[in-house]
């Protein structure tokens, strides 16, 4: 697969992941673009979506896999992003930042371009200014336009992976573990009045 990041990130789902255990078989209440109710019961093992920064798998329901000559690959009901060997916390990343913004929450995320995975959304509940390794104040919320593929490609540092709950899709994607990331040139397109 294509190399998506210079950093050797692993992105995977694993039904046996400690603290994020989920069903070891597919349970689809309705058919969608990546799963079919006809796939219910499909056994799920660890699936590496990225390994070492390189694309490993895409989702395929049984019918799509048959058409493509691929193996059916259903999404596991958890998601882990990890940079092997990385450690440290958000505070550690802040301490090593000369000047930047600390984003604590992204929400109202919508797809703009499915071909590039371009998303738009808003920051919320805390955008902090960092100078010389310290948080020196808060600033406005912003609208952003970014592709998660581009974010991983530009990431220059990651902390240790910790359990996280996404604000936007937390009721659907509630088993995740992610590291804090340093991402130069994150695209803030405009100031938002959201608070």
Predicted regions, residues:
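Dual-mode signal for accessory low-complexity, basic/Gly-rich regions
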Residues: 2-195
């Amino acid at each position: 697969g294509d190399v998506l990041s210079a950093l050797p990130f692993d992105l995977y789902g694993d039904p046996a992941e400690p603290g994020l255990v989920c069903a070891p078989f597919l349970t689809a209440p309705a058919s969608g673009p990546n799963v079919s109710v006809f796939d219910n019961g499909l056994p799920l093992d660890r699936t590496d979506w990225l390994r070492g920064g390189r694309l490993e798998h895409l989702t395929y329901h049984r019918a799509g896999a048959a058409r493509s000559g691929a193996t059916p690959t259903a999404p596991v009901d958890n998601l882990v992003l990890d940079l092997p060997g990385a450690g440290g916390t958000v505070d550690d990343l802040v301490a090593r930042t000369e000047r930047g913004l600390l984003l604590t929450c992204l929400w109202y995320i919508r797809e703009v371009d499915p071909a590039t995975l371009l998303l738009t959304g808003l920051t919320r509940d805390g955008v902090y200014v960092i100078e010389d390794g310290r948080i020196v104040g808060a600033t406005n919320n912003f609208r952003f336009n970014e592709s998660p593929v581009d974010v991983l490609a530009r990431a220059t540092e990651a902390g240790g992976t910790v359990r996280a709950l996404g604000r936007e899709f937390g009721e659907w994607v509630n088993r995740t573990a992610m590291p804090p990331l340093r991402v130069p040139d994150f695209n803030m397109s405009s100031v938002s009045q959201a608070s």
